[in-house]
Amino acid sequence: MSATMRAEIDPLAHSATVDEMVEAITKGDDSVTTIVDDLVWHATPRFVTEVREVPGLPPSFTTTSVTDMRVDASSEKLMLTLDGQEGSEISCETYMRSCLDLPAFKGFSLFVVTPLEDRVNVLGVAPVILSHRLVLYRPTDLIDFTLCIIQMYLENCSTKRATSSLFVQIECILRNISKTITPLLKMRRLMYIGATWTLNTLMCVTNHNPFDQARVLPNYMMAKMLLGQKSNTPAILDAIYSAGYRQTLSKRPITPCPSGVLRCNKAHLNAPLCTKVVADTLYSWWTATDEKPVPESIYVLYD
């Protein structure tokens, strides 16, 4: 296989490594910044859900609260259509304020994975490790909240909603957000990375030309090439993108996720979230302890 072809089907084929960074630092190479910038793309948030909990009742992990979105041309605000409120819109800012005013709103849960661990239909992470990849994020800044909403919507976007118009509007928002990212805003950068991977991958799997081919999750690109839209694909190919880990590999008991706790409609980019292993891990993680990993526990944050 030629290097050119390999690069086309594997966006990470020529990505930097820690060894390259150490070597560059040793030599005083000016490329260190570029290498570091490339390395941060190897960790991405996935499967964003809104978390709500009322005392005495089971928690709720929701991915379906936003059913449509667009950018208003005059105000340039992100407008949302909420589940059950078709025909009316509210701004993302208004929705953020309403969420933050509700004691039941706990924030967003998300998994931090590598692009190669995202195997299309399952996650290539053992349950014993998967629970340590979960983070609870409760953004109070509109930009950060917007990134969470965008990723959650794109991950659960149906073919009908995945239009060129939507993609252009979201890309414009992300381009503007990228200008606000500084080294101090680590969670914003992480969420921007996630939204960028998700946007380009959704474009790829819905037969649109991605804005950045190098930011299409590699397994989704390969799965599209190998599996296409065929309904009778060879079992060995199905296994590549559907073989995960059994819960028996977990060292601690996993509490089954009750019916209705995770609200998720299967879409192009959220198949792993709909699996029993991931749902049970998410529920067990939430109910096992009151202390959840937050941005402060995964990053060294600066004042």
Curated annotation (Swiss-Prot):
Record-linked Pfam families: Herpes_UL7 (PF01677)
Keywords annotated in UniProt: Host cytoplasm, Host Golgi apparatus, Virion, Virion tegument
Primary location group: virion
Record family assignment: Belongs to the herpesviridae cytoplasmic envelopment protein 1 family.
HAMAP family: HSV_CEP1
Name of the molecule in the record: Cytoplasmic envelopment protein 1
Compartment(s) where it occurs, according to its Swiss-Prot or TrEMBL record: Virion; Virion tegument; Host cytoplasm; Host Golgi apparatus
Taxonomic classification: Viruses, Duplodnaviria, Heunggongvirae, Peploviricota, Herviviricetes
Organism: Equine herpesvirus 1 (strain Ab4p) (EHV-1)
Function: Plays a critical role in cytoplasmic virus egress. Participates in the final step of tegumentation and envelope acquisition within the host cytoplasm.
A GO CC term attached to the entry: viral tegument
